[in-house]
């Protein structure tokens, strides 16, 4: 179903395809002074793109097929988008369909990780926390499972999307979601140290810099961007986060029409620390693959030592709102 082509050391494999479709293969040039390791020595990651609906079991079936395909192709880690579990028609349905982390649905994904022998980034689970009974609000929770199906990290989205975009309609995530209170330290995985974030978080460079400072080599932004902000901001933001943090950026995305009133932009992608898009999905559900070259990342940081040139003495009020 998917073919690979051996590339010169300064180029990366870029693949993207829809299920039952011919793959798209391309190469991306790198700065001549920076070399890569032999491609077959590098860990392979898979970025999954889906169209979630309110039907949780149908969504699981779709995600499971993509994860199984990723494992068959040799990926060590598969990334699923925000709201991989479901996208409801309204806030009331969202709350009704939500589950705790120890619920049945996450148990199915744990079993899937075990059976496939693959790590899973579950990019935005509608979590009923321990305070559910008190406030009837959920968390938007990014869960990381290892290949044994164990939860090794969970991050609750800290920046909630309360916006009004002309042509896209209002979004009030805080009406039914509580913000998380902390960042999760980067997690060591077979692909590198992964920093967890979710969708709207990508608009806050402070978060990406904080995760990079804490040791992240890969930043992941599972998302469900809309049809207006997607074309305007999606790729620009992801490339900016990669360049400023000198990390790989992996963004699994929702795509297509979820129900009568909701659609997502798609265009899942992987960006390297130079800011090059090294893999992207085609239109519709499917996955793309990329190899993570940490030697190239270290070279980037050596040749452009921006973290050594930072002036924190000048940035004291950076996290404050505009006056």
From Swiss-Prot:
<dbReference type="GO" id="GO:0005737">
    <property type="term" value="C:cytoplasm"/>
</dbReference>
<dbReference type="Pfam" id="PF00795">
    <property type="entry name" value="CN_hydrolase"/>
</dbReference>
<feature type="active site" description="Proton acceptor">
    <location>
        <position position="82"/>
    </location>
</feature>
<dbReference type="GO" id="GO:0005739">
    <property type="term" value="C:mitochondrion"/>
</dbReference>
<protein>
    <recommendedName>
        <fullName>Deaminated glutathione amidase</fullName>
        <ecNumber>3.5.1.128</ecNumber>
    </recommendedName>
</protein>
<dbReference type="InterPro" id="IPR001110">
    <property type="entry name" value="UPF0012_CS"/>
</dbReference>
<feature type="transit peptide" description="Mitochondrion">
    <location>
        <begin position="1"/>
        <end position="33"/>
    </location>
</feature>
<dbReference type="InterPro" id="IPR036526">
    <property type="entry name" value="C-N_Hydrolase_sf"/>
</dbReference>
<keyword id="KW-0378">Hydrolase</keyword>
<keyword id="KW-0963">Cytoplasm</keyword>
<comment type="similarity">
    <text>Belongs to the carbon-nitrogen hydrolase superfamily. NIT1/NIT2 family.</text>
</comment>
<dbReference type="InterPro" id="IPR003010">
    <property type="entry name" value="C-N_Hydrolase"/>
</dbReference>
<feature type="active site" description="Nucleophile">
    <location>
        <position position="199"/>
    </location>
</feature>
<keyword id="KW-0809">Transit peptide</keyword>
<feature type="domain" description="CN hydrolase">
    <location>
        <begin position="42"/>
        <end position="294"/>
    </location>
</feature>
<feature type="active site" description="Proton donor">
    <location>
        <position position="157"/>
    </location>
</feature>
<dbReference type="GO" id="GO:0110050">
    <property type="term" value="F:deaminated glutathione amidase activity"/>
</dbReference>
<dbReference type="InterPro" id="IPR045254">
    <property type="entry name" value="Nit1/2_C-N_Hydrolase"/>
</dbReference>
<dbReference type="GO" id="GO:0043605">
    <property type="term" value="P:amide catabolic process"/>
</dbReference>
<dbReference type="GO" id="GO:0050406">
    <property type="term" value="F:[acetyl-CoA carboxylase]-phosphatase activity"/>
</dbReference>
<keyword id="KW-0496">Mitochondrion</keyword>
<comment type="function">
    <text>Catalyzes the hydrolysis of the amide bond in N-(4-oxoglutarate)-L-cysteinylglycine (deaminated glutathione), a metabolite repair reaction to dispose of the harmful deaminated glutathione. Possesses amidase activity toward deaminated ophthalmate in vitro. Plays a role in cell growth and apoptosis: loss of expression promotes cell growth, resistance to DNA damage stress and increased incidence to NMBA-induced tumors. Has tumor suppressor properties that enhances the apoptotic responsiveness in cancer cells; this effect is additive to the tumor suppressor activity of FHIT.</text>
</comment>
